[in-house]
Amino acid sequence: AVAKLLAAADVTAALEGCKADDSFNHKVFFQKTGLAKKSNEELEAIFKILDQDKSGFIEDEELELFLQNFSAGARTLTKTETETFLKAGDSDGDGKIGVDEFQKLVKA
């Protein structure tokens, strides 16, 4: 669903760059996919897709499945990748990423 908002070639390249376990780097991924150039409104729409349980936050279970939002056949993130991703985005320390935190993380 997220892939519809991005160029297919960019998504493919970004996913290729993190096929191996523990190779995911959110900053690189956001740059390669073009997410880093999206407006806050576009990022909010993407956030709502990533927030699969519609809680208003992206929790670790949803982060683990992050890549699959871009391609159904993509791998899940490892525990280490998920923890690193969460730590990078969770600026208030509540153990989850809100929409404002997500926007800041993507644009960082």
UniProtKB/Swiss-Prot annotation:
Residues 38-73, 77-108 form the EF-hand domain. CDD domains: EFh_parvalbumin_beta. This is the predominant parvalbumin in latimeria muscle. This parvalbumin has an isoelectric point of 4.52. Ca(2+) 1 binds at D51, D53, S55, F57, E59, E62. GO terms for cellular component: cytoplasm. Belongs to the parvalbumin family. PROSITE patterns: EF_HAND_1 (PS00018), EF_HAND_2 (PS50222). This is Parvalbumin beta. GO terms for molecular function: calcium ion binding. Ca(2+) 2 binds at D90, D92, D94, K96, E101. Keywords: Acetylation, Calcium, Metal-binding, Muscle protein, Repeat. The modification N-acetylalanine is found at A1. In muscle, parvalbumin is thought to be involved in relaxation after contraction. It binds two calcium ions. SMART domains: EFh (SM00054). It comes from Latimeria chalumnae (Coelacanth). It comes from the Eukaryota. Gene3D superfamilies: EF-hand.
